[in-house]
């Protein structure tokens, strides 16, 4: 796979940047590859929120390392939210509950919802994107691998959630016109 830049990624002579929430899982890894293919300069943010499956962060780091060895320049930062999110109730982060196994059903998987997780992650990557705008004067996409198949279980994977979040971010920040959500796996359901 070769990295390339198209005219649509150019912003006054510079490359449009992307900041993405990168778990290292299947959805975010496929999104990272898509962004590479589309020619974006990418900053990946992985979150340690006290999740029981620390393999995600290990996979994220391994995936980035592999891509760097292939010649791709990708920034990768790991943000530690364990203290803040330790007060939340979810089977993914508390020892008081077990993570359900087996078929991916709403009733069974509801315990895996981490309250407000995608809003928190989006806020952090949005703030980071605003910092890039201020330093570099470029447009930035903030990307998440959320997809429409998750919305039945995870309310923060719904198109209307991201539309509302985008409106709130634009109201609450200067330079927000330079930032857009990039959500290709729910893109057909939403226009932000």
Language model regions located:
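ATP-dependent adenylation/nucleotidyltransferase module used to activate substrates
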Residues: 2-190
């Amino acid at each position: 796979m070769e990295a390339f830049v198209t005219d649509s990624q150019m912003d006054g002579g510079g490359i449009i940047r992307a900041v993405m929430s990168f778990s290292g899982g299947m959805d975010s890894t496929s999104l990272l590859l898509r962004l590479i293919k589309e020619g974006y300069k990418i900053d990946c943010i992985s979150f340690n929120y006290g999740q029981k499956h620390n393999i995600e962060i290990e996979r994220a780091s391994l995936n980035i390392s592999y891509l760097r060895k292939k010649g791709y320049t990708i920034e990768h930062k790991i943000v530690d939210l364990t203290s803040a999110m330790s007060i939340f109730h979810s089977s993914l982060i508390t020892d008081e509950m077990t993570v359900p196994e087996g078929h991916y059903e709403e009733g069974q998987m509801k315990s895996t919802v981490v309250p407000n997780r995608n809003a928190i992650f989006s806020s952090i990557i949005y703030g980071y994107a605003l910092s890039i705008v201020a330093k570099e004067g470029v447009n930035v996409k903030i990307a998440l691998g959320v997809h429409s198949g998750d919305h039945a279980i995870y309310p923060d994977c719904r198109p209307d959630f991201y539309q509302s979040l985008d409106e709130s971010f634009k109201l609450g920040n200067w330079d927000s016109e330079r930032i857009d959500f990039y959500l290709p796996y729910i893109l057909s359901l939403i226009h932000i």
